[in-house]
A protein has these predicted regions:
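Conserved Nudix-box catalytic region and its N-terminal flanking loop in Nudix hydrolases
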Residues: 59-97, 102, 154
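Histidine-centered active-site/metal-ligand motif
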Residues: 48, 68, 80, 98, ...
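Short, well-ordered beta-strand micro-motif
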Residues: 55, 130-132, 152
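NUDIX/MutT-family hydrolases
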Residues: 139-170
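Active-site segment of metal-dependent pyrophosphate-handling enzymes
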Residues: 101-137
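Actinobacteria-biased recognition of intrinsically disordered, low-complexity terminal regions
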Residues: 1-8, 171-175
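Acidic, metal-coordinating catalytic segment for phosphate/diphosphate chemistry
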Residues: 14-52
């Protein structure tokens, strides 16, 4: 078992889910990690933990979304855990920094939500964080995104799916 696996197991064990649906996912994720020593890695065929972060600029009331090149959807930043990731939060912060080009992002201390979804590669057991951007932060598009854009809170429901809207609602409640 890797250090990242141990950290992900601890995070899921200690996380206080905000409702019954999230608690059921928390238990399912924890069980998956108990059953799969490789459950944090892309190679785990039955599904794997991923880490994402919704980049928020609370001073401007906006969030940064990336237009995923392969899926064609406006999403929060995030992706697969990598061997150099020591913690789940570190993986989420790395992904957010790489995909947004914004330095000085700061994660809220615990996950905001969990979201399980099927992708072309496997089932993703996504652990979602909120990342606070410095006021006036400027994003720089990466090769992983077709586009990168700031949206006012009230615009998100018109461009993103329900999972992103729920992540925004939960993240704002944690601010």
């Amino acid at each position: 078992m890797s250090g990242l696996h141990a950290d992900a197991s601890r995070v899921l064990r200690e996380w206080g889910a905000p409702d019954e649906e999230q608690e059921a996912l928390r238990r399912a994720y924890a069980g998956h990690l108990e059953d799969h020593p490789d459950g944090v890695w892309r190679g785990c065929a039955s599904g794997h933990i991923t880490a994402s972060a919704l980049v928020i600029d609370p001073a401007a009331g906006r969030v940064l979304l990336t237009l995923h090149g392969k899926l064609g959807l406006w999403l929060q930043t995030g992706g697969h855990c990598e061997p150099g990731d020591a913690t789940l939060a570190g993986a989420a912060l790395r992904e957010a920094t790489e995909e947004s080009g914004i330095g000085g992002l700061r994660l809220l201390p615990e996950p905001a939500r969990l979201d399980r979804h099927r992708t072309p590669c496997a089932v993703h057991l996504d652990v979602q964080y909120a990342a606070l951007a410095p006021a006036g932060a400027r994003a720089v598009i990466s090769e992983e995104s077709a586009d990168l854009r700031w949206f006012a809170y009230e615009e998100v429901a018109g461009v993103a799916d329900a999972s992103v809207v729920r992540l925004l609602e939960r993240s704002r409640a944690l601010l």
